[in-house]
Amino acid sequence: IRDVERSRGLGDVYKRQELGIKQIKEFFQLNLSSELRLRRVTAPLFVLKGMGINDDLNGVERAVTFPIKDLGDAKAEVVHSLAKWKRLTLAEYHIEPGYGIYTDMNAIRADEELGNLHSLYVDQWDWERVITAEDRNVEFLKEIVTRIYAAMVRTEYMVYEMYPQIKPCLPQKLHFIHAEELRQLYPDLEPKCREHAICKKYGAVFIIGIGCKLSDGKKHDGRAPDYDDYTSKGLNDLPGLNGDLLLWDHILQRSIELSSMGIRVDKEALLRQLKEEGEEERLELYFHKRLMNDTLPLSIGGGIGQSRLCMFYLRKAHIGEIQASIWPEDMRKECKEHNIHLI
């Protein structure tokens, strides 16, 4: 953890900090809902194992699992995120194109590498919206991302109105770039360092094509093959209809990822991506059968980190200043030495 120059807008007064967190969350989700025409729904904390509903994220993270006594010890998994569950829910609620849902998602990611931005506990707004086949293009993706970013800019101004010491720093315009273009721009840097470099330059960036193979044969970052479409043609005929939204954090002096989102796979993209990853056996799972049988709507969706968003607006150096979680003792000690008080 860096010994950083931190804003004292809220000082160490927990009462004002908790009020700030509450107001940010209420204001932002109201703006998100109205921007994208989303209805709030209640989401599960866990789902049955073996249904293909839980998300695999990068494909290697272990889900927290437990047996259910009344179901003959059938296994349940605490969710990683709700990408596939939301799409099933859109079908169940018969949501029309142009409308969608959002939810408060709480998850446990036991394999997370803990640090300033990463916790065992994940809280985010998970959202999903029904689209048409004509919407499955990069221009529509950019339109939706721009609307989400507009809600972020408005929220930052609300924080400034509440706490004038916290000056707005977000640029009015979001910069779009494909992961391949980013690689060519900074060929000698690793993917995370490319993110830091481009974010420092523009302040707010959306990187398209997360999960697709770049010209060097590597991926910018991993994605599970069965929710985001990262292989269909997108920006400048490069593959990918998904991406990550990143902001430059002036406190940590690095980029932070606030949202991961994308146009979801249709049948063709699902088959293509499962084959590419050698995971065609997933087609036997419940979610995948529903998709292949045309009983799920086309959709776009993503997640927006609640704690990270609050951390950014309130100029905090560690996510543990926003949320309660478990941290290594040496991390707590180091934070305390730098006047960073973890909840």
Give residue ranges: language-model regions:
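N-terminal "assembly arms/tails" that initiate or stabilize quaternary assembly
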Residues: 15-90
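Generic, well-ordered alpha-helical scaffold segments in large soluble proteins
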Residues: 27-35, 147, 151, 312
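Single conserved hydrophobic/aromatic residue that forms the stacking wall/gate
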Residues: 1-14
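A generic structural motif
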Residues: 126-137
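Conserved alpha/beta core surface patches that mediate binding of polyanionic ligands
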Residues: 82-124
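Alpha-helical scaffold segments that mediate packing/assembly in large oligomeric complexes
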Residues: 153-191
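A translation/RNA-centric and nucleic-acid-associated enzymatic feature enriched
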Residues: 108, 179-343
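Compact, glycine/acidic-enriched structural inserts
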Residues: 140-159
